[in-house]
Design a protein with these regions (language model features):
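Short helix-boundary/capping micro-motifs
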Residues: 11-27
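A short LG(V/I)-centered, amphipathic sequence patch enriched
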Residues: 41-62
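Alpha-helical linker/hinge and terminal dimerization helices associated
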Residues: 43-44, 64-91, 98
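Central regulatory/effector-binding core of bacterial HTH transcription factors
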Residues: 93-157
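Hydrophobic/proline-rich hinge and linker segments of small-molecule sensing/allosteric domains
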Residues: 160-203, 270-278
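Secondary-structure junction motif
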Residues: 194-218
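Hydrophobic hinge/microswitch elements
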Residues: 218-261, 265
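A late-sequence structural motif
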Residues: 261-301
């Protein structure tokens, strides 16, 4: 039988990245946290944490963390229901937090609008980890989140992968810059395009390379780049003429400050909702809301 206090200490150390911050969060002494972690590791017969500047979970620790979070969520559902029943449904349910990993474009364009009614109705809090869609599954694997919007189609261990649809991206630039990328006949010149900077969300963002590979046959092309890791600022940089970039087509509706560099040329990113196979009632509601929102806003695949 796992000790609840040891699990609490373990979860806090991973969440806060160290023994000291975990001790402060739990209002315990540092030695007390260390003793609980050592007892947990000794009891299970393996290391659960990698000690370093920022403490992180081992593979075994990641599996244990996912278990701990699943149990915590299910307990929160049960306690919330019991309290509501004891109060005769007279009082509001306690707020419950759900951790998810999502790419920034999805958060801005369809995820939040789609799940907002659910969050308000069931008093759910979101703890969102923003990462590139090709990397969000790392947070699920580590046990940090209960679900993620990902490009990974194969279900991870202990998880379910459900298709959501595709986000369609278009290569755009400010009208003046788009014109500079074309020849006198109006044809796009890839050499002219690559002479201008691309606006890229962060160093994990590979959409620009995907566009160049898909439509020009270029592999690992060299071109200047701006890195702008914020959605509003990213789009503003393109609209201001700082460079060209890939923007979801939903974000282009009604805009006149950006136009397609190569009209009709798109990149589709197929997305999946990866989540724990063993879900609490609240997590199940979120899964259904995510799927419904995706069906409304994403392209079918």
């Amino acid at each position: 039988m796992l000790d609840a206090r040891q699990l609490e200490a373990f979860s806090a150390v991973v969440e806060h990245g160290g023994f000291g911050p975990a001790a402060q969060a739990l209002t315990l002494t540092l030695p007390a946290v260390s003793v609980r972690i050592k007892a947990l590791e000794d009891g299970l017969g393996q290391r659960l944490l990698v000690r370093g500047k920022r403490v992180r979970a081992t593979a075994a620790g990641q599996a244990l963390l996912a278990h701990v979070k699943q149990v915590q969520m299910m307990e929160a559902d049960v306690l919330s229901g019991l309290k509501a029943g004891a109060a005769g449904d007279a009082g509001p349910r306690a707020w419950q937090s759900l951790s998810v990993a999502i790419n920034a474009d999805s958060v801005a364009s369809w995820f939040l609008p789609g799940v907002a009614p659910l969050l308000q109705r069931h008093r759910l809090l979101l703890d969102i980890v923003i990462d590139d869609q090709d990397h969000t599954h790392d947070a699920l694997k580590s046990g940090e989140v209960m679900g993620c919007v990902s490009t990974l189609s194969k279900a991870m261990r202990g998880c379910v992968a459900e298709p959501l649809g595709a986000m369609r991206y278009r290569c755009v630039a400010a009208p003046a810059l788009a014109q500079r990328c074309r020849t006198a006949t109006g044809k796009v010149s890839v050499h002219r395009l690559l002479s201008w900077p691309a606006v890229i969300f962060n160093r994990k963002d590979a959409l620009q390379d995907a566009f160049l590979a898909q439509h020009f046959g270029l592999q690992q092309p060299n071109y200047p780049r701006h890195f702008v890791p914020a959605i509003d600022a990213f789009e503003a940089a393109i609209a201001l003429g700082l460079g060209w970039g890939m923007v979801p087509e939903q974000q282009l509706v009604g805009r006149t400050d950006m136009e397609e560099v190569l009209p009709g040329a798109t990149v589709d990113v197929v997305l999946y909702w990866q989540h724990w196979a063993r879900e609490s009632a609240s997590a199940q509601r979120l899964t259904q809301a995510v799927k419904a929102a995706a069906a409304q806003h994403l392209r079918p695949t």
